[in-house]
Swiss-Prot record:
UniProt source species: Xenopus tropicalis (Western clawed frog)
Name of the protein in its database record: CCR4-NOT transcription complex subunit 7
Sites where the protein binds a divalent metal cation 2: 40, 42, 230
Lineage summary: Eukaryota, Metazoa, Chordata, Craniata, Vertebrata
Gene3D superfamilies attached to this UniProt entry: Ribonuclease H-like superfamily/Ribonuclease H (3.30.420.10)
Entry cofactors: Mn(2+); Mg(2+); Co(2+)
Length: 285
């Protein structure tokens, strides 16, 4: 299979409250032929650490994720659609959903907001024209994109990304126990390939998404640290890696459903002493 490529005529569609319904109709059509969905989110950093005793480092990392996702709001979601051959839909391949976010009322980490602002995110527009998450969830649940075993999700170091999606889809805080989180995850997203987890089997690949893309000689489209561009690059990286390192076949038993840094696949540092939360919150994706 040729390496997955996207020419510059492919474009990212910006979605706000005013065009959400129309764009979700388009996605319902696209998902029928392009059933690989590369995903990324942007969120306002990490503002809290859990306190108390934890059964393991993995438990600490999940509780860190849970307390921050429960406290904070998603800012952007990027979805890129690809078919089995690594081909993108003609015209629009990527949708960037911009959610309601208010810098006066909502919690955030200052360094994360500064990074996102410098990347071109327009917080005033998010406040005035952003999508309500509850209405998005209603449309998303019936889109054919979630709850479908035929849809394959592609992500990069995505514990927080899926955490925010589960919070939106369930309209509730994340479960207290990590095993329950993974049960809900499998319900909504039965097939997931986390590119960062796949990298464990790819000799010499290292770093964040941008660094990996450069090693794979992929060209980014759109601004870094925006969810649409990052989801597009995630999809490109997956198909290039599948070709180069996996002979165009991913072993589901070994790789499907694992999120880098969570569960038995945890690659985080010692409990409470490292910068794992900073790596995830400020990941180059």
């Amino acid at each position: 299979m040729p390496a997955a490529t996207v020419d510059l005529s492919q474009r990212i569609c910006e979605v706000w409250a005013c065009n959400l319904d129309d764009q979700m109709k388009r996605i319902r059509q696209v998902i029928r032929k392009y059933n690989y969905v590369a995903m990324d989110t942007e969120f306002p950093g990490v503002v809290a650490r859990p306190i108390g005793e934890f059964r393991s480092n993995a438990d600490y990392q999940y509780q860190l994720l849970r307390c921050n996702v429960d406290l904070l709001k998603i800012i952007q979601l990027g979805l890129t659609f690809v078919n089995e051959q690594g081909e993108y839909p003609p015209g629009t391949s990527t949708w960037q959903f911009n959610f309601k976010f208010n810098l006066t009322e909502d919690m955030y980490a200052q360094d994360s907001i500064e990074l996102l602002t410098s990347s071109g995110i327009q917080f005033k527009k998010h406040e005035e024209e952003g999508i309500e998450t509850q209405y998005f969830a209603e449309l998303f649940m019936t889109s054919g994109v979630v709850l479908c075993e035929g849809v394959k999700w592609l992500s990069f170091h995505s514990g927080y990304d899926f955490g925010y999606l589960i919070k939106i889809l369930t309209n509730s805080n994340l479960p207290e126990v990590e095993l329950d989180f993974f049960e809900i995850l499998r319900l909504f997203f039965p097939v997931i390939y986390d590119v960062k987890y796949l990298m464990k089997s790819c000799k010499n690949l290292k770093g964040g998404l941008q660094e990996v893309a450069e090693q794979l000689e992929l060209k980014r489209i759109g601004p870094q640290h925006q969810a649409g561009s990052d989801s597009l690059l995630t999809g490109m990286a997956f198909f290039k890696m599948r070709e180069m390192f996996f002979e165009d076949h991913i072993d589901d038993a070994k790789y499907c459903g694992h999120l880098y840094g969570l569960g038995s696949g945890s690659s985080y540092v010692q409990n409470g002493t490292g910068n794992a939360y900073e790596e995830e919150a400020n990941k180059q994706s």
